[in-house]
Regions:
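Gly/Ser/Thr-rich phosphate-binding loop
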Residues: 1-3, 12-127, 140, 223-224
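Amphipathic alpha-helical transducer elements in NTP-driven molecular machines
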Residues: 6-9, 27, 31, 178, ...
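Alpha-helix/helix-capping structural signal
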Residues: 7, 89-90, 155
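Glycine-rich phosphate/pyrophosphate-binding beta-alpha loops
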Residues: 88, 157, 210
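Active-site glycine-centered loops adjacent to acidic/histidine catalytic or metal-binding residues
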Residues: 88, 111, 133, 180, ...
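Conserved ATP-binding/catalytic segment of the ANL
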Residues: 135-202
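C-terminal boundary motif of the adenylate-forming
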Residues: 181, 186, 220-226
């Protein structure tokens, strides 16, 4: 497995796009054709819990990999990676889908130091792009009235050393305030929208999530950071 923050995966995707741009017109057409054929295969694979939806999809992916994808995975140094993991910030679903198309499943995870690193993780059968997966064992979750994710469980830390005031600020009735605004799906998967402190509130009282705009901008190979 390979674990990286969103910026690592974004830079790898951009390095492929830059490399393709420097190839011959014929090679670019081959790449574009393979990506077009590979996208629905990856989408069906995601909808099927991470498994190929049919033998036809498996065979077609093998052909596309032979023609194009294997060389791209080798270029990135991930040809032997069975699964990747992405966490630490929000990430565009298009970035994750890019690697699924290449044949490297990238699973989103969520957590923080105060929750012992990981509290949510995608896994086969729970692979919705843009979601951080269901909870790990014995951890509970709920949201506050303003949408902040709250966690409770044996893996949650007890408090900050020698700082009772800081500890009191992040706990409420044994629930840890993560500082992240989320949507929780019926399946239990968490969709992290943004940091609570980064949410913009308009004069009309509407909440705007900057990360959605930032991730859309970063899908462009011409924009490094937004």
């Amino acid at each position: 497995g390979f674990l990286g923050v969103p910026r690592i995966w974004e830079k790898m995707q951009q390095s492929v796009l830059y490399r393709v741009k420097d190839t011959t017109p014929f090679q670019r057409r081959v790449y574009e054709a393979c990506m077009r054929r590979g996208r629905p295969i990856a989408e069906r694979r995601l909808a099927n819990g991470g498994q190929f939806a049919s033998m036809g999809d498996r065979l077609m992916f093998g052909l596309l990999s032979l023609i194009c994808f294997r060389s791209l995975r080798t270029f990135l140094g991930i040809n032997r990676v069975r699964a990747g993991f992405c966490g630490g910030a929000t990430v565009s679903p298009e970035v994750l889908l890019f690697f699924w198309i290449l044949g490297v499943p990238v699973y989103q995870i969520y957590g923080m130091t105060e929750s012992a690193g990981v509290s949510h993780t995608q896994r086969p059968g729970a692979t919705t792009l843009g979601r951080s997966g269901p909870l790990i064992a014995e951890v509970e979750q709920k949201t506050s009235p303003d949408g902040e994710l709250l966690l409770r469980g044996p893996s949650i830390f007890k408090g900050y050393l020698f700082d009772e005031a800081a500890t009191a600020r992040v706990f409420s009735d044994s629930w840890l305030h993560t500082g992240d605004i989320v949507d929780i799906e019926a399946s239990g998967e968490a969709h992290v929208l943004d940091r609570k402190k980064d949410i913009l509130i308009t004069s009309g009282g509407k909440n705007i999530t900057p990360s959605l705009i930032e991730n859309a901008l970063k899908d462009s190979p011409y924009i490094r950071e937004a």
